[in-house]
């Protein structure tokens, strides 16, 4: 397979993450729901389903996809449900989580036959970037006033608390969970379930997985609740690459390799959060790897190679599964990467191609 660009999902690496999730579930008793906002490539769901309990969503379409393609337990969350969405959402969901007391007041009766929850905002997080900080000033994400939370009791069976972001520090997780226990314990002990959301980087290298499992079990036992986690990035970290080809090489005081992809169109989160792509760093031949759109800052980052690059060379951009395929777009009309899976036997299945007809159909 030579046609680039394409996202290449590695089945063996994905299973490694899944086995860590399975180990955490077994030791802690917690349930794990795939966060579709991060990764929703449903052709990989058959690999993941044996190791996870279901999906959680942030919109009606994600919810529908989770029910249709993943099955098992399906949680529905949205910052705001609309009148023309709520009946369909309730039809797909096992649990529906409202973002605010006003949404619970408005739609709670419609959802009385399924489990209802509310988003609890503890007013702190591990995010170091304001754009992704649910505890930022004037946050619209969840309720934190105990009087408003009390007003929901009797109508909800659980809460969702999403406050971690790429948190690989177990001690910090432990400390912040203790704060939640101290401040909201009187409410938690009257619930049946608590989702601690995603953002816990427990599949990363050297993470103390058993310590996390034991802490989750203690939380569950102390408050008598079923714990849920919503791993997105933790499910798919280091499981895919974006495969690109060098189209041109420039030297404008710095060697630049232009590839057949775009950070704006194909790895947008890196641009948003001012991060560089994970590029090769072996060798003494250094190049800036740049995309092919007209955006001046369409730059993946600097890479090093053991020998000079040539037009036609392939480059693998690592860790390209999370928040990539769900955010890819048609900026400049640049060809959208195909999606492929490298199977455990080494074979590669090219599972989705995108064509001009897809581009045209996305417009009007």
Predicted segments — roles?
Residues 182, 186-191, 211-222, 303-316:
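Acidic/histidine-enriched ion/cofactor-binding microenvironments in catalytic or ligand-binding pockets
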Residues 12, 101, 121-123, 162, ...:
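Anionic group-transfer/hydrolysis microenvironments
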Residues 1-71, 77, 81, 262, ...:
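N-terminal capping/small domains of soluble enzymes
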Residues 169-174, 203-212, 238-248, 304-305:
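Short glycine/threonine-rich loop-to-helix capping motif typified by GTGT followed
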Residues 35, 164, 194-203, 231-234:
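Glycine-rich beta-strand-to-loop/alpha-helix junction loops that act as flexible
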Residues 226-364:
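Charged (often Lys/Glu-rich) extended helix/loop segments that serve as interaction or gating elements
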Residues 30-193, 207, 215:
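Active-site-proximal beta-alpha core segment in soluble small-molecule metabolic enzymes
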């Amino acid at each position: 397979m030579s046609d680039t660009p394409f996202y290449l999902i590695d089945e063996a690496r994905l299973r490694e993450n899944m086995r860590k999730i399975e180990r955490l579930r077994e030791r802690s008793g917690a349930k794990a729901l795939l966060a579709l906002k991060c990764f929703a490539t449903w052709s990989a769901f058959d690999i993941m389903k044996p190791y996870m309990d279901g999906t959680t969503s942030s919109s009606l379409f994600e919810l529908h996809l989770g029910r249709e393609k993943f099955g098992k337990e399906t949680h529905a969350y949205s910052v705001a449900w609309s009148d023309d969405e709520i009946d369909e959402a309730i039809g797909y969901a096992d649990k529906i989580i409202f973002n605010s007391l006003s949404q619970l007041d408005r739609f709670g009766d419609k959802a009385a036959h399924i489990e209802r929850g509310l988003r609890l905002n503890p007013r702190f997080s591990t995010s170091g970037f304001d754009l992704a900080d649910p505890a930022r000033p004037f946050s619209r994400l969840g309720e934190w006033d105990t009087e408003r939370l009390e007003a929901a009791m009797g109508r909800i069976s659980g809460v969702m608390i999403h406050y971690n972001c790429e948190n690989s520090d177990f001690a910090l997780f432990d400390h912040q969970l203790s704060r939640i226990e101290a401040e909201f314990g009187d409410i938690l002990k009257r619930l049946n379930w608590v989702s601690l959301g995603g953002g816990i980087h427990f599949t990363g290298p050297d993470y103390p997985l058993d310590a996390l499992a034991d802490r989750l079990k203690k939380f569950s036992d102390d408050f008598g609740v079923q714990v849920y986690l919503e791993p997105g990035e933790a499910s798919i970290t280091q499981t895919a690459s974006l495969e690109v080809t060098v189209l041109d090489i420039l030297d404008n005081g710095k060697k630049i390799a232009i590839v057949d992809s775009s950070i704006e169109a194909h790895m947008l989160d890196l641009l948003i959060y001012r991060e560089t792509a994970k590029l090769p760093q072996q060798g003494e031949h250094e190049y800036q790897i740049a995309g092919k759109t007209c955006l001046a800052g369409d730059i993946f980052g600097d890479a090093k190679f053991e020998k000079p690059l040539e037009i036609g060379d392939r480059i693998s951009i690592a860790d390209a599964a999370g928040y990539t395929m769900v955010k890819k777009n048609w900026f400049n009309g640049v060809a959208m990467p195909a999606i492929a899976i490298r199977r455990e036997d080494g074979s590669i299945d090219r599972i989705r191609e995108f064509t001009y007809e897809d581009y045209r159909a996305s417009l009007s």
